[in-house]
Amino acid sequence: MRVAFCHPDLGLGGAERWMVDAAKEVQAHGHHVVVYTGRHDPKQCFVETNDGTLDVHVAGTWMPRHVGGKMHAWCAYLRCAVVAWKLAWEAWRKRRPHDVIVVDQVAFVVPLLRLWTHARVLYYCHFPDLLLSAPKTALHRAYRAPIDWIEETSTGAAHKILVNSHYTQDVFRTTFRTLAHVETHVVHPAVDVPKTLTTREDAWMQLETDENNQDVAEFCRRAKHLFLSLNRFERKKGLELALEALEWMHQNTSVDGDDLPCLVVAGGYDPRIHADVQYNMELVDMQEKAQSKAHVLFLHNVTDTTKHALLSCCTAVLYTPTFEHFGIVPLEAMAREKPVIACNSGGPMETILHQKTGFLVEPCPSAFAEAMQALTSDPSRAAHMGRLAREHVQQRFSRAAFGDRINQEIVDLAKESNQ
């Protein structure tokens, strides 16, 4: 069976991680897989998209991302339309039609692909886009109205719709009123559970052997307790909460000197996006004024190898977004025996077991800090929670189970076209 994936931008986010994992698993089940995208930067992508594991085709890079800082959504629609056209054109030109096309993030291309191909189209909804761009003025509402209508109508054109969590499923039903009757299936993302774990000491050595990570290795070595935030440098991710929680601990604890906890804030960063550049500057400025400034390290666009080493070094992971649609980071952390402290809303409510594999707390500095203190004051508890976390991920969120599920959804959809 021939399966194509259509994704707008192959960066370093959770949606991209899902797409890469899904494509790899479908390919592992014996199907021919090809990925089409509107952007693929070899310096800001997952390794599988750049080492030959996946067959990646890029189109529409010549199109602008915005017009004078405006019209981002319309530009994204047009760029994705070019990607969809290339997908359809190459399939027709090579006389190798696709059986199923998997689309995510930009539903606009769903009806186009149905028009230009004979493939069955599966749409994976990470979260309704219209809720991510709440209109602030009457003019903005007028601008968003046709975009929101297109999103809802285009989503409904898919032959099958999958969502990433029960939380997103509920939001989908209340947001897309005209699609309330449409059946959706929850397919949670998954992570690799490593067979063996890297010790903290080995992780230090791994960082030290990389000339680009000398400072990182030194920072991690001097931290008796290291907390790690893994998220894109975007305002909606609430990274300032991690900084504020660390500052709260520094100001409200009797411990001082080298025994004070440290924090690494790492994640994807796109210097082309003005809002992200501005947010990054605000975070740096905020930390420069903090009492805990020497105990924080910012890292942009870390490699998977560095990320895994940081996970091995840390005491726990801080996951700061509120009402996150799903959140792959908690799974990545728990798979490596690290408890997670997250906000008590959205997707993490489905993945983290409170006081067993981590803590689900209010999104305020004191609540996060108290959970952090519970782990630093009792290392054996942190280790025990980590072991439970790994078992939890193995049982419910393994890559193998995810692969079987996504493959079955695609196979079932392909069979429908023959009935």
Spans of model-derived segments:
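Membrane-proximal helix-turn-helix segments that form the acceptor-binding/catalytic region
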Residues: 129, 140-161
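Conserved donor-binding/catalytic core segment of Leloir-type glycosyltransferases
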Residues: 4, 208-237, 243-248, 263-265
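N-terminal strand-loop element at the rim of the active site
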Residues: 5-12, 24-76, 168, 271
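Short hydrophobic beta-strand element within catalytic cores of glycosyltransferases
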Residues: 339-342, 352
